[in-house]
Amino acid sequence: MQTTIKSPVRFDGVGLHSGAPARVTIHPASAEYGIWFRRTDVDANALIAARWDQVLPGVKLCTRISNEAGVEVSTIEHIMAALSGCGVHNALVEVDGPEIPILDGSAVPFVEGIVAQGLRRLDAPVRAIEILAPVEVREGDAIARLDPSDTLYIDFHIEFSDSAIGRQTKTLNMANGSFVRELCDSRTFCRQVDVDVMHANGLALGGTLDNAVVVDGAEVLSPGGLRHTDEAVRHKMLDALGDLALAGAPLMARYSGHRAGHALTNKLLRALFAQPDSFRMVVCDETMAARLPGVGVRPSDIPAMAQAC
């Protein structure tokens, strides 16, 4: 059955790119509502659907959605990953400005808040998007692809010249709470040279060594080092789950990303929905629903994960 959060939960922090204070609150919603964002600092046209066709194309450093009036919310990928990875199908996300707070750079604060509140089952079945045929998009060396599968798998490969990251590959079945155990604590990352360029262009003004993994060659500059030896590829998988959640329903698919980013994953969803024969909507029976992301999440997964960091 569809779910929502039992009661509101609030998060306070700063926007990664703006550096401005930001507050976000996740509210319960009724069945069939889906996920919507609402700007509380805007008087009219404040609602934005968390959907693939609301994403502004070509934005590289984050996922930014906009409504027909031009009202925007940026950096939604981590909170979307947390909602998807915890199995929340319906919620209203209120934010008091144009950017979701970055918090610690991962999705674990959002996950902790959602799991602490718990979920409420709603009187409506879950519908999923079943992939029937491969869909692939490319940009240079980057590839994003969806293949048929009876559950959501994410395969990801990255390559960076900085040896602190290097080449990393990981595959994960997203069922049975694996997002919480394996991915949600992995932080956004960047190279020091990229930080310098972003700062020169007025970006990443809220970024610090406490909310991002910054590397310079073989050196990890962030205090405490890495949470996982392959934290970078895990974070790319986290981002991918958040961006795929903008499909509007859980995906039964195998997603493969090779050096892919936010813009390419959105391009993949646009390609998918432009090919109606490549997918179908299915009403999930109990067996199918048990294979979706977020099913089986336990509160004990979070402290067990945190102790491993």
What residues fall within each predicted segment?
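C-terminal regulatory domains involved in ligand/effector binding and gene-expression control
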Residues: 1-90, 94-309
